[in-house]
Amino acid sequence: MNHFELFGLPPQFSLDGSLLSSQFRELQKRFHPDNFATASERDRLLAVQKAAQINDAYQVLKNPISRAEYLLSQNGLEIRGEQQTMQDPMFLMEQMELREELEEIPHGSDAESALAAFDARVSKMYKQHLASIEQELNDAQWPQAADRVRKLKFIAKLKNEIELVEEKLFG
């Protein structure tokens, strides 16, 4: 049973987050190991395994990057944990320039506004890539979707770096 089947969801990138959460809570309740306290040792072990499977599946499906990676793996393209280098020099150059720009923001005269504008740009880029991934997955364009996921990972890392700069600037 795959993660989508476990939650009773269609195997697609776009999903209803609130439905996923409610299904997760329902499955958690149903298979919570405490419910099997008086059951046989075998049934208790199965309940623990099922609870772990439910938790793992939820973690994968709730995150758009891991959800896309999972969909790709379900279609024969395993990119989770891969060490393949990015083959798009223009994208890599853009990422380097964005990181350099982020490094300069704290030293500028209006760091707060500059960081907010920078964050908005990167968030827009992130959303555009998510939309492209959804389309590529819907169209079964697996290699293109895989490349887009690799790029989205770079952008997600940049978003995390923005948060770190924000914490340093504003505590």
Curated annotation (Swiss-Prot):
Single GO term (MF): ATPase activator activity
Keywords: Chaperone
GO CC terms of this entry: iron-sulfur cluster transfer complex
Gene Ontology annotations of biological process type: [2Fe-2S] cluster assembly; protein complex oligomerization; protein folding
J domain ranges (all copies): 2-74
PROSITE patterns: DNAJ_2
InterPro entries to which the protein is assigned, alphabetical: DnaJ_domain, HscB, HscB_C_sf, HscB_oligo_C, J_dom_sf
Xref: SUPFAM superfamilies: Chaperone J-domain (SSF46565), HSC20 (HSCB), C-terminal oligomerisation domain (SSF47144)
Keyword Chaperone part of the UniProt annotation: yes
Keyword Chaperone: yes
Oligomeric form and interacting partners: Interacts with HscA and stimulates its ATPase activity.
Record's function text: Co-chaperone involved in the maturation of iron-sulfur cluster-containing proteins. Seems to help targeting proteins to be folded toward HscA.
Family of the protein in this entry: Belongs to the HscB family.
Identification of the protein by name: Co-chaperone protein HscB homolog
Organism: Vibrio vulnificus (strain YJ016)
